[in-house]
Amino acid sequence: MNASDFEKNRIRIPHRSALPLNRSNMPSGNEISLKRYTQNRSVRIPEDFGPRQSLKGFDPAYRNIIDYIVRITYRIWETDDREVDYIGQCYAPDSVVFDDYGLQKGSKKIISDTYHTTAAFPDIVLDAEEVIWAGNDEIGFHTSHLTRIIGTNTGESRYGAAKGTRVHFLVIANCVALENDIFLEHVLYNTSAMLKQMGVDPWKEAERLAHDPPPGWPRSEAVWNQLKTSASPSLPISEQDLVAGFDPDAFSRSLHHNVWNKDGSSINAYYQDDFVFEGTTDRRFSGKEAYTEYIREIREVFPDLKLGVDEVYWMGNASEGWLISTRWSAEGTHLGDGIYRQPTGRACQIWGCLLYTSPSPRDDEL
């Protein structure tokens, strides 16, 4: 890979901290959106990269934040040259990444992990299904990138010899970027879904990890607090900046609180009858009843579960509807029988990211 003039001449600022968003940082339209960028997903990398957006400090090759997120991903993972080392130009050298396994620090670790994955899945594709963004080039761009990974395990990996199996599963990466550097990321690789599709028993892999934990695990209380509070507002946007009518922040926080901490009545009130859910460990289902059962299974295992919303941002407006990204965290004690085998009495930390669409409700639904 030949370094561009931008790469040769850029000055990087170390040790950035992610600033929380406010209501004014949310895009009120869809001019810069994945739907328009991909022409309603009819193309993956378009000829026209879309409207020019202020991107101070970013490589001028990128037109807007959607273009940046989609094309750096494609360049790293899928081009003929497969420029894995380009990660060093779009992740800060001291980047902080919270993932399935714990806390990863620095772009070199990301580069190493990516080489491992591309060797295990030489035909890998990372197909963007949605990108929700907010922010700007002063406070930072916050992006929630929903990607479907597709590939065939024809290479050796940390899970053993090549299995020859085809995989397809969702990944969500919530990033904060300034001046061409992603410096904070909360990413859920959905490792359990990948393992199941590869024919690897997730329980056996969990036992192996317990005896030989990877870097960043177990997660300390300090790291857990950092995971929850990084980029989070000290006070919810809906409390610090009240608005009349529908408020995506208030809606998302109320919905999560009701579903996970209370009686779950919001499922019937706000979810479509045939809504589609896809989540961790290859969970795929549709409809309110299936979702209610999923929530019941989790709460049965962790009867004292308490969930809190850490960050909400969104795109949209009342006429076109809303795209909402919500990052949450929860704590509970493994006290119940069920999907996680015999209760251990251990305190557990759970976190996740959720992307969903919401039409504007009627006044009588608020």
Segment roles from a protein language model:
Residues 150-165, 331-346:
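Short, cysteine-centered beta-strand-loop-beta hairpins and adjacent loop/turn segments enriched
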